[in-house]
């Protein structure tokens, strides 16, 4: 029997025990007959199931060790809840085996419902939640978005996209260009004020809920650049917006962040430039990750969104002359791949 079927059997036995305890402790009566269905999976090894019965609904996370570790999720869930951010309530946990029984934040993500008409309201709620956790004191034992992490991320682009997807190797001149550009992006990120960073604060990880939004997938949180999450929110892997609207939303966030005491840049143009460069660093990383998911993990579907990230990068290059040589490098690589 495949290993994942064995895990599902183990999870089902564990879930039955936890539901019995949960219903007893809350005086809900006997556990009703329920259904366990696949809720979602993602680009990692984690997968999610939804249990529903007699008006009750829970989500179960299956995060198999050693590939996954539930402990950061649990710790950061409590941290965000302390800031009144709407995150799943953890009803039961088995950290050794990688099982969590969670409250259900609903079935509709922002990505499912967002459109040009409702985006202003949905993003206003997302900004409110972001400001809540950016106000938290930086005293939790979280990693720092330091030089090593930023560099490790950006190097995914030459390793996996250039090397594996395009099948190319940098020339000496291209390598020198890459080193200059990546250093510029890293220096800009490190120069920014620091806050708690979710790292994937995007519509796919925000649920339409009450209160809105429900926030998910925060287990990789770090302390890092103040522009990271807000840039991620508006320059998503799966949906794009006109630049004028993005700048308007960035301006709204910047003004509210200043009023809330978040350490953003004093001038909007400096904030906007930092956001632009932060976005390019993230986009290069994600292009590399999507190539890795394809070639290492056998999940090619994510490569279909790579052109969106190149469009984001090219848009920034058009207004940031300091990144002109990145545009030339990308053009050379794409021409080389076609040759």
Curated annotation (Swiss-Prot):
The EC number(s) this enzyme carries: 2.7.1.221
Catalytic activity: N-acetyl-D-muramate + ATP = N-acetyl-alpha-D-muramate 1-phosphate + ADP + H(+); N-acetyl-D-glucosamine + ATP = N-acetyl-alpha-D-glucosamine 1-phosphate + ADP + H(+)
Keywords: Antibiotic resistance, ATP-binding, Carbohydrate metabolism, Cell shape, Cell wall biogenesis/degradation, Kinase, Nucleotide-binding, Peptidoglycan synthesis, Transferase
Source organism, top-level taxon: Bacteria
MF (Gene Ontology): ATP binding; carbohydrate kinase activity
Pathway: Cell wall biogenesis; peptidoglycan recycling
Pfam family, one: APH
Any one of the GO BP annotations: N-acetylmuramic acid metabolic process
Disruption of the gene: reported phenotype: Cells lacking this gene accumulate GlcNAc and MurNAc. Deletion of this gene increases fosfomycin sensitivity.
Family: Belongs to the kinase AmgK family.
Function summary: Sugar kinase that catalyzes the ATP-dependent phosphorylation of N-acetylmuramate (MurNAc) and N-acetylglucosamine (GlcNAc) at its C1 hydroxyl group, leading to MurNAc alpha-1P and GlcNAc alpha-1P, respectively. Is involved in peptidoglycan recycling as part of a cell wall recycling pathway that bypasses de novo biosynthesis of the peptidoglycan precursor UDP-MurNAc. Plays a role in intrinsic resistance to fosfomycin, which targets the de novo synthesis of UDP-MurNAc.
Record-given protein name: N-acetylmuramate/N-acetylglucosamine kinase
Organism whose genome encodes this protein: Pseudomonas putida (strain ATCC 47054 / DSM 6125 / CFBP 8728 / NCIMB 11950 / KT2440)
């Amino acid at each position: 029997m495949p290993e994942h079927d064995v895990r599902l059997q183990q999870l089902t036995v564990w879930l039955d025990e936890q539901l019995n305890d949960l219903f007893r402790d809350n005086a809900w009566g006997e556990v009703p007959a329920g259904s366990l269905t696949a809720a979602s999976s993602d680009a990692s090894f984690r997968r999610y199931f939804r249990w529903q019965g007699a008006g009750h609904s829970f989500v179960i996370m299956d995060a198999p060790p050693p590939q996954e570790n539930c402990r950061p999720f649990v710790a950061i869930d409590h941290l965000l809840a302390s800031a009144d951010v709407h995150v799943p309530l953890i009803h039961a946990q088995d950290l050794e085996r990688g099982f969590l029984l969670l409250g259900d934040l609903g079935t509709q993500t922002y990505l499912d419902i967002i459109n040009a008409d409702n985006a202003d309201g949905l993003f206003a709620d997302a900004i409110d939640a972001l400001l809540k956790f950016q106000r938290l004191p930086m005293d939790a034992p979280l990693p720092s978005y330091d030089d090593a992490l930023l560099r490790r991320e950006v190097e995914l682009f030459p390793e996996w996209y250039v090397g594996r997807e395009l099948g190319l190797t940098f020339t000496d001149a291209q390598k020198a260009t890459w080193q200059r550009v990546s250093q510029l992006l890293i220096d800009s990120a490190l120069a920014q004020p620091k806050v708690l960073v979710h790292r994937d604060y995007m519509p796919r990880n925000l649920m339409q809920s009450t209160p809105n939004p429900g926030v998910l997938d925060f287990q990789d949180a770090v302390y890092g650049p103040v522009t990271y999450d807000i840039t991620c929110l508006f320059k998503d892997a799966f949906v794009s917006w006109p630049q004028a609207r993005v700048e308007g939303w960035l301006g709204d966030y910047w003004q509210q962040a200043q009023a809330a005491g978040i350490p953003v840049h004093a001038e909007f143009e400096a904030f906007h430039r930092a956001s632009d460069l932060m976005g390019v660093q993230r986009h290069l990383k994600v292009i590399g990750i999507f190539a890795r998911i394809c070639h290492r993990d056998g999940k090619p579907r994510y490569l279909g969104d790579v052109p969106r990230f190149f469009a984001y990068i090219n848009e920034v290059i058009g207004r940031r002359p300091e990144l002109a040589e990145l545009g030339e490098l990308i053009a050379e690589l794409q021409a080389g791949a076609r040759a």
